[in-house]
């Protein structure tokens, strides 16, 4: 595989997982709590991506390595999803 092809493949890493999150959010009124499985899948894909390509690798679909580590730690502590605030008008 050429260097250019590898770079292109790396930049597209986890794209299907990121698209699945967008589809889920759009289908559920942007309620993140209903898309937890897809978010977990993306983070796992990104974790694998960094393990295979190094912490300085780049993918448009993955958070930077340090942020991914923070997100994974938060999720392990049960701080999983953003809460959807309802706008109530009187």
Curated annotation (Swiss-Prot):
Location(s) in or outside the cell: Mitochondrion intermembrane space
Q: The CHCH domain covers which part of the protein?
A: 11-53
What InterPro entries does its record include? Answer: CMC4 (IPR027179), Cys_alpha_HP_mot_SF (IPR009069)
Disulfide pairs here are 14-45, 24-35
- Keyword terms, alphabetized: Disulfide bond, Mitochondrion, Repeat
For this protein, the record's SUPFAM superfamilies field holds: Cysteine alpha-hairpin motif (SSF47072)
Q: Which GO terms describe its cellular component?
A: mitochondrial intermembrane space
Q: Where is this motif: Cx9C motif 2?
A: 35-45
Motif Cx9C motif 1 mapped to chain? 14-24
**Pfam families, per the entry:** CMC4 (PF08991)
Q: Which family does it belong to?
A: Belongs to the CMC4 family.
Q: What is known of its domains?
A: The twin Cx9C motifs are involved in the recognition by the mitochondrial disulfide relay system.
- Protein's name according to its UniProt entry: Cx9C motif-containing protein 4, mitochondrial
């Amino acid at each position: 595989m050429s260097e250019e092809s590898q770079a292109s493949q790396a930049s597209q890493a986890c794209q299907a997982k990121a698209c699945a999150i967008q589809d889920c959010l759009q289908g559920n009124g942007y309620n993140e709590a209903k898309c937890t499985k897809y978010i977990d899948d993306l983070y796992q894909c990104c974790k694998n991506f960094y393990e295979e390509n190094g912490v300085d690798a780049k993918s448009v679909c993955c958070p930077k390595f340090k942020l991914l580590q923070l997100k994974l730690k938060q999720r392990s502590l049960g701080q999983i999803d953003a809460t959807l605030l309802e706008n109530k008008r009187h």
